Amino acid sequence: MIDHVGISLPSLAEGTRFFGRTFELLGFSGEPYEGGGFVEWEDFAIGEASVDRQLTRHLHIGFYAPSREAVDAWWRDSTASGYESDGAPGPRPEYGPEYYGAFVLDEAGNSIEAVNNGPRRQPGVIDHLWLRTRSLEDATRFYEAVCPAVSHTVERHDGRTQIRGSGATFSIVEGPPTEGLHLAFEAPDLATVVAFHDAGVGAGFVSNGEPGERPIYHPGYYAAFLLDPDGNNIEAVFHDR
């Protein structure tokens, strides 16, 4: 399961307004967590881009909508607020017989979607992601190396690779590469965190933080980090609460 996804935007204030309104319209209750320069809604977090925090670009995120009416309301509200449409509400049968989605571009040009497509995939707000990469073969090799450790499967298709677990899915295609993305897999124990990191480093990929506790996030936050071939920060995390 995906534990969380983090992106960086030009303005934290505007991102908080836009995504806060998004999740209100999509029926998610509860206040976001704010701290450490981030705002987080369940499994999705935003921060402000800076010299030390790369702007997130060329990413697609689909958020779960409880109904087609919620998709419509979100798109109308977002476009009325000045966000550019990236696709009006409607069926998308190429993705599935019940698939109904709408799309806008966020302030960094990322494609944001509200989608109604059956039951929610996992607790949280994220339904799926699409990443772009310079080399589909290199990106696929990375995920083939690390995903078995975190109980995700990697499926090669014509022109794309899909990663599946027990919750949200993500797919990878070639194109202008996704940048500034942080994606964390949930780990059931510390041994899984270590296995994830060892698998990536053993396959020749770059460590971005060895396994260990990160109490800055919370006591018992055990994590390890790798860079994917496009430089995105990929994590496995065990919450020992």
Regions found by a protein language model. Give the residues of each.
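Vicinal oxygen chelate
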Residues: 2-11, 53-125, 127-135, 202-241, ...
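Short, charged/polar, Gly/Pro-enriched secondary-structure boundary elements
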Residues: 53-54, 110, 168-172, 232
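Active-site beta-strand termini and strand-to-loop segments that position acidic
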Residues: 38-43, 104-107, 162-167, 175, ...
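Structured core of small recognition/catalytic domains
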Residues: 130, 137-140, 149-214
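Core segments of cupin and vicinal oxygen chelate
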Residues: 6-45, 130-169
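Conserved active-site tyrosine of GNAT-family acetyltransferases
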Residues: 15-19, 78, 109, 139-143, ...
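A short, glycine/Asx- and small/polar-enriched loop/turn
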Residues: 40-45, 55, 97-99, 164-170, ...
